[in-house]
Amino acid sequence: MTDTKKKLGLVIHTVWFWIAWLFFVPLLVQYLFDSENYIADFLGEIITIGLPAQLLISYRDKSKEKKEYLYRIEDVSLKRLPHKGLMVSMLSCMLLFLFVTYAINTAQLVYYLRTKEFYSFSTVEEFHLLGFTMALIINALLPALLEEILYRGLYRDTFRNHNKFIAIFIPSLVFASLHSNIIPMSNAFLLGMLLMILYQRSGSLKLVIILHAVYNILGIIFNQYVSLPFTTLSLFNSGSNESQIVYALVISISVSLLSLVMIFLSVGYCFKGNNPAMKINRNKSGFMDIIMIIFFFISAVLMILLKITNPGAA
């Protein structure tokens, strides 16, 4: 019965996410802001994920005598995890970023060779410290915190009595389905699978929050400010000819395959034989509320500074 209630809570959240994302968030942007900006992104993240996650964590099961919390989030201190496991898990996260980047790049290069039309998902922008800081907070750190609490923490607790494949696949599929199109969905699905595997093997929610944040930061840096070698953007900016593009395609395929093999090896190694005792965190301290207030305050201050120093910025 308890598992049914947990699943119902997650289903309700998924329905709420789509209602809020399709109706409330666009209205928020339309009537409160001139265009999409970091504050709108922040409020959208809070409305669709932050507040619902807080409500689910705070919900008490009234059918039990002591009215215990319905969801229980497992979390092991990072200090209790082996250093090699921590380093290898970080490496596996970076390898996944390389795999996704060069797999997409391979598809773009093949598309160009067949159609002679250039297409890239990345853009190189001029670096502004304030804008970069805002992107780190709103688009990297905040989603990592809220999404891991929900899609790894709460889903892990809900599916703990199912087999490992279901416990990994279902949360990753739901996590991916909430992204906009096929490329972000595929990226989110692979990331969700990796993070859930590492969460199951380590028992540390803090670890997967950090890994998710690192992955987001890599995406911001290499999709907006720096182009990796042999990618479509770097090739066409340098005026490469067709033979150079074919060479880049071979490199891109090789990097993708090598990264994929190394991911499997690193995940198999992470925390091998390690089975730390789980620590139950019932969120009695109001941690989520404090974090949301801090993020809102910081983002509001930075947004004001951004408008003052660069009035044309979003």
Task: For each feature predicted by the language model, list its residue ranges.
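Juxtamembrane helix-loop-helix connectors linking adjacent transmembrane helices
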Residues: L32-F42, R72-L146, I304-A314
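Alpha-helical transmembrane segments of multi-pass integral membrane proteins
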Residues: V246-V261, D289-A313
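Functionally important transmembrane alpha-helices
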Residues: F23-V29, P184-L249, V267-G268
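Residue-level signature of the transmembrane alpha-helical core
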Residues: L91, L136-I137, L141, L145, ...
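Hydrophobic alpha-helical transmembrane segments
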Residues: V11-I12, W16, L43, L86-L91, ...
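Alpha-helical transmembrane segments in multi-pass membrane proteins
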Residues: W21-E65, L249-L257
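Interfacial transmembrane-helix boundary/kink motif in multi-pass membrane proteins
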Residues: T2-A20, K67-T101, A277-S299
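Function-critical hydrophobic alpha-helical transmembrane segments in multi-pass membrane proteins
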Residues: F121-N181, M185
